[in-house]
């Protein structure tokens, strides 16, 4: 077993301590409770406790939080020798991202009086940023070390926050469930990152890039958690009342349709009529991605079913046919197939948002037009103009993701980082003490580290 040299093994603890120290200092200087969290401010206004936003937002936050740490973490444990890293590095990267995103989004959205003011909505938005980072992590799963992932999160959270601010605040784009800002951005950031980190000798570890019965079973736990809580994910930032209610309903039915289409297509493309667990674990979730943008709009229940069915179909076909083409022709080594689960369904969701926005009328929304499309309600935009802004937002996201992912790949190629050698990718023992294997390891001579072939 090749080991990471001692000087490179110090990078992770140094980065953890440096990042925690820096964020702690910034929190001390800038971060304060908002008026619904601060004891003096809340009670000075003589508010009733039942009116506090905590009681409306915390249930959704709790579900989103579970999705980030349990759903994403366990979805990636399908690799037979990489379970510790899948869950553990998800834990590490997400916790750092939550702190960093709170600062970044705070400066952009809630900075006044010289301070960032935070509450439960800040927690939800930070979780969304962590979700995008973990999507990118899926593209390079098994081929990067924890220090590399921390640097990836450092850069990606900045670009995510700026892209989100441009779309939502400057362009007036509607993207409640993040088809563009979370899924499309995270997927294509990760794909371009993977392209820059391409390994020509990855075949040396290909025997580890497979699953076994138990690893697939644990990954299915992640799928079920994500599937069950996805309506909360899409509805968490939406306006209270009918908007949040409608978002849950649309997401719910879209997920059911994507699941049925995934089972159907998986059996059809297998050749012998048997199901592929990779398809079920991933493509069944595409319905939640595809309605992210349009979930708060008047999509209609039939529209949600149709969108989910299309997303499940496209995602399943992507896993079967498109992923091998991406690697062989475009040198994109997408470990988790994020292009199929998040990338293509995210683009479909953005286009769906364009179409539904173009059909927005006061007759369809009534006074609810003010909460879903405030610029149309105020007469500052037509429905067609809003649709064009939605489309432009998709292209802005792709630019940020592609340029950012490429820059991130160059950053992660720095020689002092903890990249695993080609022959030890998808292997927990490079970074973790694995029970039952330490004694056997000490009885074998350790090989010197092999150079990797990231080019």
From Swiss-Prot:
Outline the segment boundaries, as ranges, of region: Interaction with ANK3: 413-421
Keywords for this protein: Ammonia transport, Cell membrane, Cytoplasmic vesicle, Glycoprotein, Membrane, Transmembrane, Transmembrane helix, Transport
Q: Which SUPFAM superfamilies match?
A: Ammonium transporter
Its tissue distribution reads: Expressed in kidney by connecting segments and collecting tubules (at protein level).
The cellular component terms of Gene Ontology attached to this UniProt record, alphabetical and capped at eight, are: basolateral plasma membrane; cytoplasmic vesicle membrane; membrane; plasma membrane; spectrin-associated cytoskeleton
User: What stretches pass through the bilayer?
Assistant: 11-31, 59-79, 84-104, 122-142, 149-169, 177-197, 217-237, 248-270, 275-295, 297-317, 341-361, 391-411
Question: Which Pfam families would you find in this protein's record?
Answer: Ammonium_transp
How is it placed in the membrane, per its record? Answer: Multi-pass membrane protein
Where does the record say carbohydrate is attached?
46
Family of this protein? Belongs to the ammonium transporter (TC 2.A.49) family. Rh subfamily.
- Its recorded name reads Ammonium transporter Rh type B
Organism source for this protein?
Answer: Rattus norvegicus (Rat)
Supply the gene name: Rhbg
